[in-house]
């Protein structure tokens, strides 16, 4: 009965963890409008009622973003796009604790700390809309669990190794930065995980033989990664010093790398775990997690239970934590022209692994800790549900502008103020993509410009200013003539267009801080 109760409590916590994704019309994720626009274009690439066939073509090459875009596009055949995306995000939120439990069970450790992962699903990476990266995290934890099983489950090694091969390749198809963590994590697990045959093994070959299936399981993923590296690095990178979104020099040259100081990284390590809402309310679920973890740490020291792991195997989880922290503190923030916001993303992974490293306590205490961990989902559902609904009310200005947008629009986003009163991230930055996606049009800035997108422009991309962050560089004569809709936020249209507003342009709608200007 107690085991059944534990399962019901855990299931309820998982439902509460994903609930905030379903209580609001809009989600506060900076890049989400861009993602949905590209998925819509991918799904309707041959739809003549849209601009997509004219603007975009499939990029028939290996890119690390294929996983998210194609998964949601497939779901879109069954349900509307927004619902498909929420189902995908729900799978990520629920998958985070489930994958952590899978890893812990493979290591022979108690699984109750996995539920503490739920509040960590909604942090800085979520606010920026790094959905590909987020989706790769549960898959990476599953890879670690599969790798350990391929080493230790003597009669099922081939099956676990085959599953590992598939999962590792899938990680790469979601995000290469998570794959980079596994490039360090799997060798560490190989070195610290004993196999049953070690007891009687004599010589290197005898120790290596039972590990061969696990090693073979990583070969397809590594081969896929090398193929992508050759393809990516073989493409010429456009070098323009000082230009946004372009390399400033050779890939790893000092001028092409942007760093955060150690002090800044240290200060942000805990902050980025809960920095979504301006009122700081999202810290309360994290405080609850911290309180449970602190109690578990004290109980593990005062009333320790025999560890199921040997002295070397006991180092596996702390080692994984140190690897994630090393990536956080030692990597650059940007590799210009290649990848951005690099090191800060690993804070979430380090925190997840740290929670999984809590000391083992007696079974009776583990049940209490499981209930306490599940209880952390209550403030999570309340705080994030309220916060998401508050943001959705603010973002309803998009809905008004969509109604005033014509079919097949060419929308230029001029976002002078991307900020929100509710969330800290600049969530209104890509509002033009929301209008374009709703009406089957195009925008002045699209992720189709990036080499990791599954789509590319058919011809020359539409003219625009160098960075979506700098609308003050907009030039109507050379850029504006290519568009028939203009989304302006944070500045009156008269300041942007002057006399043209009375002649060739007119205000079609205004809501909140945004205006929609259309060509007459």
Task: Go through each PLM region and give its residues.
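Transmembrane-helix signature of polytopic, membrane-embedded enzymes
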Residues: 3, 100-121
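Transmembrane catalytic cores of multi-pass membrane glycosyltransferases
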Residues: 22-34, 46-48, 65, 167-319, ...
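Short hydrophobic/aromatic helix or loop-helix immediately within or flanking a transmembrane segment
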Residues: 37-44, 56-81
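Transmembrane-helix motifs of polytopic, lipid-linked glycan transferases
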Residues: 87-107
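Short acidic/glycine- and proline-prone juxtamembrane loop motifs at membrane-interface regions
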Residues: 128-136
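Short hydrophobic alpha-helices at membrane interfaces in multi-pass membrane enzymes
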Residues: 149-169, 205, 209
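Signature aromatic-anchored transmembrane alpha helix within multi-pass, membrane-resident enzymes
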Residues: 289-292, 356, 360-385
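Short periplasmic/luminal acceptor-recognition loop of GT-C membrane glycosyltransferases, typified by
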Residues: 391-394, 401-491
């Amino acid at each position: 009965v107690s085991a059944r109760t534990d399962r019901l409590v855990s299931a309820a916590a998982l439902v509460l963890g994903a609930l905030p994704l379903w209580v609001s019309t809009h989600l506060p994720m900076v890049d989400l409008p861009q993602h949905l626009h590209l998925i819509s274009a991918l799904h309707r690439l041959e739809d003549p009622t849209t601009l997509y066939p004219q603007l975009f073509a499939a990029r028939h090459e290996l890119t690390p973003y294929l996983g998210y875009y194609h998964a949601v596009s497939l779901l879109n055949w069954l349900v509307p796009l927004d619902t498909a995306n929420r189902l995908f995000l729900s799978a990520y939120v629920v998958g985070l604790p489930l994958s952590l439990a899978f890893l812990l069970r493979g290591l022979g450790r108690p699984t109750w700390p996995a539920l503490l992962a739920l509040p960590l699903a909604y942090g800085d990476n979520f606010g920026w809309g790094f959905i590909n990266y987020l989706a790769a995290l549960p898959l990476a934890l599953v890879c670690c669990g599969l790798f350990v099983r391929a080493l230790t489950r003597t009669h099922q090694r081939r099956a676990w190794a085959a599953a590992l091969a598939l999962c590792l390749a899938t990680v790469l198809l979601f995000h290469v930065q998570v794959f980079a963590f596994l490039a360090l994590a799997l060798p560490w697990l190989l070195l610290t995980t004993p196999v049953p045959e070690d007891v009687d093994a004599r010589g290197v070959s005898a120790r290596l033989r039972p590990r061969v299936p696990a090693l073979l399981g990583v070969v397809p993923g590594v081969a896929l990664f090398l193929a992508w590296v050759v393809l990516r690095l073989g493409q010429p990178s456009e070098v323009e010093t000082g230009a946004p979104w372009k390399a400033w020099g050779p890939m790893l040259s000092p001028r092409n790398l942007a760093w955060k100081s150690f002090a800044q990284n240290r200060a942000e390590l805990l902050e980025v775990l809960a920095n979504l809402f301006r009122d700081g309310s999202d810290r309360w679920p994290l405080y609850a997690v911290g309180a449970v973890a602190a109690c578990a740490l004290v109980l593990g020291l005062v009333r320790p239970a025999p560890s199921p792991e040997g002295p070397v195997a006991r180092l596996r989880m702390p080692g994984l934590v140190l690897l994630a922290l090393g990536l956080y503190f030692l990597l650059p923030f940007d590799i210009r022209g290649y990848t951005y916001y690099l090191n800060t993303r690993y804070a979430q992974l380090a925190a997840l692994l740290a929670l999984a490293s809590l000391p083992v306590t007696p079974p009776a205490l583990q049940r209490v800790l499981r209930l306490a961990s599940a209880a952390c989902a209550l403030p999570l559902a309340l705080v994030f549900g309220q916060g998401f609904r508050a943001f959705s009310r603010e973002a309803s200005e998009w809905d008004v502008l969509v109604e005033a947008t014509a079919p097949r629009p060419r929308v230029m986003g001029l976002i002078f103020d991307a900020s929100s009163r509710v969330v800290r991230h600049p969530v209104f930055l890509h509002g033009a993509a929301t209008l374009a996606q709703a009406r089957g049009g195009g925008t002045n800035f699209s992720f189709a410009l990036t080499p990791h997108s599954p789509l590319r422009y058919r011809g020359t991309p539409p003219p625009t200013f160098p960075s979506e962050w700098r609308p003050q560089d907009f030039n109507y004569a050379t850029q504006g003539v290519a568009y028939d809709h203009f989304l302006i936020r944070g500045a009156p249209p008269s300041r942007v267009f002057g006399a043209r507003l009375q002649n060739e342009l007119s205000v079609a709608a205004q809501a909140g801080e945004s205006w929609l200007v259309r060509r007459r």
